[in-house]
Regions:
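Metalloprotease/metallohydrolase-associated module, dominated by Zn2+-dependent proteases
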Residues: 1-13, 120-152, 168-217
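Disordered inhibitory propeptide/activation segment of secreted metzincin zinc metalloprotease zymogens
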Residues: 1-70, 132, 207
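Short, polar loop/linker segments at the starts of domains and inter-domain junctions
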Residues: 68-76, 190-195
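Generic beta-structure capping elements
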Residues: 62-64, 107, 181
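Divalent metal-coordination and catalytic microenvironments
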Residues: 59, 85, 159-162, 178, ...
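Generic detector of well-ordered alpha-helical segments enriched in charged/polar residues
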Residues: 41, 79, 103, 179, ...
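Short, acidic Gly/Pro/Ser/Thr-rich loop/turn segments
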Residues: 66, 111, 185
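Metzincin-family zinc-dependent endopeptidase catalytic domain
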Residues: 72-164, 168-171
Length: 217
C-alpha cells in the first residue's frame, strides 16, 4: 500500500452538506463559453454546486472475506479499469472506506425505476474534515455486479468510474467508454474522445479540487 497522500489523510468527520453550506458554496452562473466544447463535453451535467472535478482521488475497494475465482475476476476487472483511468488521474488507494472519495462495492445495484443494471455510480456532496480543516468533497459509491463476465465487468467498471470521476453524461458513440449504448464489443480502454472530454472537465473551476486547474488547451 502506497503511503497516504495529504489529501487522503484520515477523515475526522464527514457529513452531508447542510442548506447553509449549499447557500454559502453556491456557484454563480457561468458566462457563455467562447468556443464549442470538445468531444462529448456538451453532454456533461454539473452538480448542484458546479463541476465535480479533481486531479487526485482517494480510492477504496471492498475486500472479499472469502476470495474465490469469481471474486478474483471482479478484482481483476476493477484493477484494470482503475489502471486505465490512472493514466489520466492520480488515484491513491486507502485502507478505510471513510477516507475515500471513490468506493467500489462488490454488489448488484438495486432496481431503479423498475429497471435492473449491472453497475451504478451514486454521488453525494459532503463536508469532510481532514487535519482539522473542513472542505466540500464528493463521495461516490460505485456498485458493480460481480455476476458478469470479465470483459463486460471491465467495461462496466470503466463506465461507472467515469461517472465517479466527474463525467456525468453519456457519449453518443459506441467506441467511447462513456457511451450510452455499447456495441457488441464494449470498449476496454479510454478513447481519445474520453481523454479529451476529461481534460476539458479538469480545466473547469471546481469547489472540490484542492489544487488549481491546469491551463486550458
Amino acid at each position: 500500500m502506497i503511503p497516504a497522500a495529504p489529501d487522503c489523510a484520515p477523515v475526522e468527520q464527514r457529513r452531508l452538506l447542510s442548506p447553509e453550506d449549499r447557500q454559502r458554496l453556491a456557484v454563480p452562473p457561468s458566462p457563455p463559453e467562447a468556443s464549442p466544447r470538445p468531444a462529448y463535453a456538451d453532454r456533461l451535467q454539473p452538480s448542484s454546486l458546479g463541476w465535480v472535478s479533481r486531479r487526485s482521488w482517494c480510492v477504496w475497494i471492498e475486500p472479499d472475506p472469502q476470495p474465490d475465482r469469481f471474486s478474483g475476476l471482479w478484482r481483476q476487472a476493477v484493477d484494470t479499469a482503475l489502471a486505465r483511468w490512472g493514466r489520466e488521474l492520480t488515484l491513491q488507494p486507502v485502507e478505510r472506506a471513510d477516507d475515500a472519495h471513490i468506493r467500489l462495492w462488490r454488489r448488484r445495484p438495486p432496481r431503479q425505476d423498475g429497471r435492473a443494471s449491472l453497475g451504478r455510480a451514486l454521488l453525494s456532496l459532503q463536508m469532510v474534515r481532514r487535519g482539522g480543516a473542513d472542505r466540500p468533497a464528493p463521495l461516490v459509491d460505485v456498485l458493480l455486479d460481480p455476476g458478469q463476465r470479465l470483459q463486460g465487468l471491465q467495461a462496466t467498471a470503466l463506465h461507472e468510474l467515469g461517472h465517479g470521476f466527474g463525467l456525468w453524461g453519456h457519449s453518443d458513440r459506441p467506441d467511447d467508454v462513456m457511451t450510452a449504448v455499447p456495441g457488441p464489443r464494449p470498449p476496454s480502454d479510454l478513447s481519445p474522445r474520453d481523454r479529451e472530454t476529461l481534460r476539458w472537465l479538469l480545466g473547469r473551476p471546481s469547489l472540490f479540487r484542492p489544487e488549481p486547474p491546469p491551463p486550458t488547451p
